[in-house]
């Protein structure tokens, strides 16, 4: 481990923090890209005859590639997460890359942090492809400053437009939970 220089002024401390934050953000983007590369290497299409013995796993929404089951545990181990957390990370990376391409471009360019892209991906997983495209178009340009409430409104609008049956089912389920005694 390299020795850390002594930071003896406020300016030096802030400069070091900014540099470390920039380095950490760039590393997170590289890991997100690596997750997509890993999924592509282990997509059901790319593993050929081994797919007969290996189960297919949908880790992202409709239209995203299916991956071989074994690859999730290996990836999770490599990033130091549980299998479930690794699957979520892998799925959210694939969701952004394949179903939210405008957002992906902003993430790769460093304009949107990975944590925010993952939050958006998690919200779009259950949308049909057209709904994800709607969210991508409306959210990508402002994703870095988007609040969770704003994201929920855009996702709900996409659900109503592109999956009205599911939107109505969710509305009724929410209404069932309300009661006055």
Indicate residue ranges for each PLM-predicted region:
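Conserved C-terminal region and hinge/linker of Rieske [2Fe-2S] proteins, especially
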Residues: 1-181
């Amino acid at each position: 481990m390299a020795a850390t220089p002594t930071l003896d002024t406020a300016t030096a401390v802030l400069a070091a923090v900014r540099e470390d934050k920039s380095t950490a953000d760039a590393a997170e983007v590289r890991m997100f890209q690596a997750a997509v590369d890993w999924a592509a290497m282990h997509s059901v299409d790319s593993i050929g005859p081994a797919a007969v013995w290996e189960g297919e796993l949908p880790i992202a929404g409709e239209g995203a590639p299916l991956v071989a089951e074994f690859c999730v545990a290996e990836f999770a181990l490599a990033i130091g997460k549980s299998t479930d957390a690794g699957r979520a990370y892998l799925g959210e990376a694939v969701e952004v890359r394949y179903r939210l391409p405008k957002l992906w471009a902003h993430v790769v360019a460093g304009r949107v942090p990975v944590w925010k892209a993952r939050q958006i991906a998690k919200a779009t997983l259950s949308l049909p492809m057209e709904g994800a495209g709607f969210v991508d178009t409306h959210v990508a340009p402002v994703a870095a400053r988007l609040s969770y409430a704003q994201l929920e409104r855009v996702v709900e609008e996409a659900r109503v437009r592109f999956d009205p049956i599911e939107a109505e089912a969710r509305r009724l389920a929410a209404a069932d939970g309300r009661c006055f005694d």
